[in-house]
Amino acid sequence: MNLDKLQNWLQENGMDVAYVSSPTTINYFTGFITDPEERIFKLFAFKDAEPFLFCPALNYEEAKASAWDGDVVGYLDSEDPWSKIAEEIKKRTKDYQNWAVEKNGLTVAHYQALHAQFPDSDFSKDLSDFIAHIRLFKTESELVKLRKAGEEADFAFQIGFEALRNGVTERAVVSQIEYQLKLQKGVMQTSFDTIVQAGKNAANPHQGPSMNTVQPNELVLFDLGTMHEGYASDSSRTVAYGEPTDKMREIYEVNRTAQQAAIDAAKPGMTASELDGVARKIITDAGYGEYFIHRLGHGIGMEVHEFPSIANGNDVVLEEGMCFSIEPGIYIPGFAGVRIEDCGVLTKDGFKPFTHTSKELKVLPVKE
């Protein structure tokens, strides 16, 4: 079905060949994903010929046994992959003048190798925007996987909360989360590097976990996600370890109110900028606008950051079936940071989150 869309696009745009280079996009079109490391793993589609998946011999049998029911062409390490690709293309079609390439995943070295095989071809057409657009709208089968990934994120939060104790390092908490995800849920891949930030470290939104230790009476920020059958989760919660100060409670409640207001306001037909503005106004009116230093959200699907960008100034119209995050944050340098994030799907009835961990301020007991 997805590959039919690609072939139709080639025909409508006068293109002969599509060169798909990102493993994630190949998975979207074929149902097969692997990590080829430094080897060549590509999908070739044509306006009027059968597509083929090109992969290392190491992955050939796996690809043949996958959901992909088209041709698979493997190559040995002793072979030149680019000359073999050219041979396969010329077997299938005489039309290879006009190429559409996924520029987001095309390296200079690979472009040069292709151009050497097809010196008279035009590689200037970019597939990236088309791919981003068709991936915007999730099918029900995709939503099932996104919801499952959300359930895994909810489980991970509970493990992380339980792991907090006096003197434990941020990295040790991350290790416990990821170990229990593997042990109890069979999760073999997180969607990004798990973030646990305690105290003033939480004021640096994307700082990785450190050897900083958790201390009583501070906020701890968790940002985590998993991959479930090729689909990502991404969620954030902030908790108090021990009794928070009044200022900590204040910034938490302002942020929670802003996030819930944006969730309640989200509907088809509004722009991404308008949705960002809902949360941003609440935080600004409370006096913390300068500490909300990023966009409200981002799309999610097979990758943890996709289109659309829920950002001030982005006038893309939100539509039913789009999946994205709503994640306002307040980060006060040298003091603390708060972020609350849910990813979900926009329906005719509003925004439906994939994660359900409570957003009331959780005050965890101090443990030795």
Swiss-Prot record:
<protein>
    <recommendedName>
        <fullName>Xaa-Pro dipeptidase</fullName>
        <ecNumber>3.4.13.9</ecNumber>
    </recommendedName>
</protein>
<feature type="binding site">
    <location>
        <position position="298"/>
    </location>
    <ligand>
        <name>Mn(2+) 1</name>
    </ligand>
</feature>
<keyword id="KW-0224">Dipeptidase</keyword>
<keyword id="KW-0482">Metalloprotease</keyword>
<keyword id="KW-0464">Manganese</keyword>
<dbReference type="InterPro" id="IPR001131">
    <property type="entry name" value="Peptidase_M24B_aminopep-P_CS"/>
</dbReference>
<dbReference type="InterPro" id="IPR029149">
    <property type="entry name" value="Creatin/AminoP/Spt16_N"/>
</dbReference>
<comment type="similarity">
    <text>Belongs to the peptidase M24B family.</text>
</comment>
<feature type="binding site">
    <location>
        <position position="341"/>
    </location>
    <ligand>
        <name>Mn(2+) 2</name>
    </ligand>
</feature>
<dbReference type="InterPro" id="IPR000994">
    <property type="entry name" value="Pept_M24"/>
</dbReference>
<feature type="binding site">
    <location>
        <position position="234"/>
    </location>
    <ligand>
        <name>Mn(2+) 1</name>
    </ligand>
</feature>
<keyword id="KW-0645">Protease</keyword>
<feature type="binding site">
    <location>
        <position position="234"/>
    </location>
    <ligand>
        <name>Mn(2+) 2</name>
    </ligand>
</feature>
<dbReference type="GO" id="GO:0005737">
    <property type="term" value="C:cytoplasm"/>
</dbReference>
<dbReference type="GO" id="GO:0046872">
    <property type="term" value="F:metal ion binding"/>
</dbReference>
<keyword id="KW-0479">Metal-binding</keyword>
<feature type="binding site">
    <location>
        <position position="327"/>
    </location>
    <ligand>
        <name>Mn(2+) 1</name>
    </ligand>
</feature>
<dbReference type="InterPro" id="IPR000587">
    <property type="entry name" value="Creatinase_N"/>
</dbReference>
<dbReference type="InterPro" id="IPR036005">
    <property type="entry name" value="Creatinase/aminopeptidase-like"/>
</dbReference>
<keyword id="KW-0378">Hydrolase</keyword>
<dbReference type="GO" id="GO:0008237">
    <property type="term" value="F:metallopeptidase activity"/>
</dbReference>
<dbReference type="GO" id="GO:0102009">
    <property type="term" value="F:proline dipeptidase activity"/>
</dbReference>
<feature type="binding site">
    <location>
        <position position="341"/>
    </location>
    <ligand>
        <name>Mn(2+) 1</name>
    </ligand>
</feature>
<dbReference type="Pfam" id="PF01321">
    <property type="entry name" value="Creatinase_N"/>
</dbReference>
<dbReference type="Pfam" id="PF00557">
    <property type="entry name" value="Peptidase_M24"/>
</dbReference>
<dbReference type="InterPro" id="IPR050659">
    <property type="entry name" value="Peptidase_M24B"/>
</dbReference>
<dbReference type="GO" id="GO:0006508">
    <property type="term" value="P:proteolysis"/>
</dbReference>
<feature type="binding site">
    <location>
        <position position="223"/>
    </location>
    <ligand>
        <name>Mn(2+) 2</name>
    </ligand>
</feature>
<keyword id="KW-0963">Cytoplasm</keyword>
